Amino acid sequence: MIVDTSAIVAIVSGESGAQVLKEALERSPNSRMSAPNYVELCAIMQRRDRPEISRLVDRLLDDYGIQVEAVDADQARVAAQAYRDYGRGSGHPARLNLGDTYSYALAQVTGEPLLFRGDDFTHTDIRPACT
């Protein structure tokens, strides 16, 4: 299973639906996050003026067994195509941001479902980890 930044932010922030996301992570034998999404997650936590939480990101990923995966050339191409087709400014209702395209790409290249929060990915052809 591929994990988008939005899923971890929802868990840390205690958003509605966070329990479902936690349970999906606990059930998953192999969870991965794209390296740019890891950076995005750290930046979001830091921006929220909660440095204590930003320091816990690595521990949280370890607790859930989420591996950070480097971006390869295939993923980069798929991410670029996703931004073209689904990105902000494309006119598509998904309105993916740049970080979203890396989660999308890793899920597409690996064929794994994507764990996310929100409705942006529901407007794409990605397979969700939770319905």
Swiss-Prot record:
Binding residues annotated for Mg(2+), in chain numbering: D4, D100
Protein name according to UniProt: VapC ribonuclease Mb2780c
Cofactor(s) named in the record: Mg(2+)
Enzyme class: hydrolase
Ranges of residues in domain PINc: 1-125
Single annotated GO MF: RNA nuclease activity
Keywords: Hydrolase, Magnesium, Metal-binding, Nuclease, Toxin-antitoxin system
InterPro entries, alphabetized: PIN-like_dom_sf, PIN_dom, Type_II_TA_system_RNase, VapC_family
Source organism of this protein record: Mycobacterium bovis (strain ATCC BAA-935 / AF2122/97)
UniProt record similarity statement: Belongs to the PINc/VapC protein family.
Gene3D superfamilies from the UniProt entry: 5'-nuclease
Function: Toxic component of a type II toxin-antitoxin (TA) system. An RNase.
Keyword set includes Nuclease: yes
EC number: 3.1.-.-
